[in-house]
Amino acid sequence: MALVVKGKVNINEFIDLTKMEKILPSMFTPVKSVMCSKVDKIMVHENESLSEVNLLKGVKLIDSGYVCLAGLVVTGEWNLPDNCRGGVSVCLVDKRMERADEATLGSYYTAAAKKRFQFKVVPNYAITTQDAMKNVWQVLVNIRNVKMSAGFCPLSLEFVSVCIVYRNNIKLGLREKITNVRDGGPMELTEEVVDEFMEDVPMSIRLAKFRSRTGKKSDVRKGKNSSNDRSVPNKNYRNVKDFGGMSFKKNNLIDDDSEATVAESDSF
């Protein structure tokens, strides 16, 4: 069963283009292309993990240009029997940022009893094409109180992004304002049965601790390598964090196809 619900991403929910930008050919407007990426997947096997995610999968970039991550739709499904206890926090991370509170772009909390969940994130910031090719985004996942034997996959996540590719810097308005996601906030994005730990510990603090632990392990590994003169492959550590300053909304609006799509444009 596919994780993503059939249907199209509604680009107008992320980007507010002017009438002129919609009507004029691309050669007469700074907006060259609004695109939806291919679906990227993460299979979560560890309780705490920091995973690479390709939010620009299938997106055609412009040399010496920019790409704006206007919006992101995340769909998750618990691979568990009904009415299991526990829950998860999912956080989008910009790995370029060294301060943990600045690296966390937004977070979402839900319980394992919620079999399938979906939320929307509005990062609305641009990076250069050169940085984009380095795959700068990660996903921090923290699962608590889910009792499953090691080596199995309790949770699957899928990601589809809406981005704008252009040569020159532009300013685009958003149809919705950025909000902090908390239980009882302006948008109800958490379940009542979610464990209290998810609200008590900010994801930025979890990210800082995770980075500190993995950094120490990396130093120990380097010391062993120099003494044994033998290379040791790096493990792909994963983690979860708190989304500060992002707007999420439950909405069934992802495309299940594996192809990137282009909208509101005729050329690059």
From Swiss-Prot:
Lineage, top-rank taxon, reads Viruses
Positions with biased composition (Polar residues): 225-237
**A molecular-function term among this protein's GO annotations:** double-stranded DNA binding
Q: One matching Pfam family, short form?
A: MP
| InterPro entries tied to this protein | TMV_movement, Viral_movement
Could you tell me the Gene Ontology terms of the biological process aspect for this record?
Answer: transport of virus in host, cell to cell
Location(s), subcellular: Host cytoplasm, Host cytoskeleton; Host cell junction, Host plasmodesma
The protein's predominant localisation is host cell
Ordered alphabetically, the record's keywords are: Cleavage on pair of basic residues, DNA-binding, Host cell junction, Host cytoplasm, Host cytoskeleton, Host-virus interaction, RNA-binding, Transport, Viral movement protein
Q: How does it assemble?
A: Binds to host RBCS at the plasmodesmata; this interaction seems required for viral systemic movement. In resistant plants, interacts with host MBP2C at host microtubules; this interaction prevents virus cell to cell movement. In resistant plants, interacts with host resistance (R) protein (e.g. tomato ToMV resistance protein TM-2(2), AC Q71BG9) at the host plasma membrane; this interaction triggers host defense responses leading to programmed cell death.
Known function? Transports viral genome to neighboring plant cells directly through plasmosdesmata, without any budding. The movement protein allows efficient cell to cell propagation, by bypassing the host cell wall barrier. Forms a ribonucleoprotein complex with viral RNA. Binds microtubules and modulates microtubule stability. Can bind double-stranded DNA. Triggers host hypersensitive defense reaction in incompatible plants harboring resistance (R) proteins.
The record's family statement is: Belongs to the tobamovirus movement protein family.
This one is known as: Movement protein
Taxonomic source organism = Tobacco mosaic virus (strain vulgare) (TMV)
Lineage, broadest ranks: Viruses, Riboviria, Orthornavirae, Kitrinoviricota, Alsuviricetes
Give the gene name: MP
